[in-house]
Amino acid sequence: MKKQLCLTIAVVACLVSVVTGLARSSADEFYKGKTVRFVVGLAPGGGYDLSARTVGRHMGKHIPGNPTIVVENMTGAGSLIAANYTYNSGKPDGLFIGIWNSALVLRQALGDKAMRFDARKFGWIGAPTKGTPSCSIMAHSGLKSLKDVLAADREIKMGSTGPGSTYDDTPRILNQTIGTKFKVVSGYEGTGPILVAMRRQEIDGGCWGWESARTTARNLLDASGNEKLIPFLIHRREPDPEVKDLPLIPEVIKGEDNLSA
């Protein structure tokens, strides 16, 4: 449970060395008039997509030659399709950047044959933010707190993009550690579709980075009635100022939280 996922930007191997090895004048000449592709492995409207578009809006101004930045979405398998594409089809020419769930690297280390890449050969260049896993539930579920979730006498449907994502891993781990009854519903292409499914009452909630949730789900967090999204758990060792009363996963697992939230 110490794992904290982060939105990771990976580029085809040797991009970092090519860029850093260029003199200013050479870089100006190389990038002038060029287009840099950001390929995002999840759907529009989610945290990965918004982070990529925010970075892309400004990054071109800080690269010699001021290239144009174009953001594309390549969804599927919790961003695995984009990761495999980055490694096998993206050209190592300094003009291609893949943005996908860094937890896929762990799946490669565990021997998952679906990972058609070698993470050691990517050029890792940064992460806009580190994610703090959190879990939220819709008011239409009739649940309002972790105490309610643990006492539920039915399965609670949690949306997921696929194995290896915070959406998928966190509820499964909580089932094994604190006895929740989450049913993981996989196959959504990103946070946007998951939020739509919540509003349609196809699912009850989801677990994903609080940094993303507080932005992408702001309208639901601020809503009232059955449309309201209620955070009930967060993976931090210290409370987050915005949701300071939420139970902390490490304390809950160790039995140090009275679940009064």
Regions found by a protein language model. Name each.
Residues 8-18:
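Bacterial N-terminal signal peptides
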Residues 25, 61-63, 85-96, 104-204, ...:
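Hinge/capping helix and adjacent helix->loop/strand transition within the periplasmic-binding protein
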Residues 34-43, 69-71, 96-97, 155-160:
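Short, well-ordered beta-strand elements
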Residues 38-52, 75-78, 160-166:
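Extracytoplasmic "Venus flytrap"
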Residues 50, 67-84:
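Early extracytoplasmic/lumenal segment of secretory-pathway proteins
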Residues 57-69:
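Signal peptide-proximal N-terminal region
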Residues 98-104, 190-191, 201, 207-216, ...:
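Beta->alpha turn/N-cap motifs
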Residues 130, 216-261:
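C-terminal lobe and pocket-closing loops
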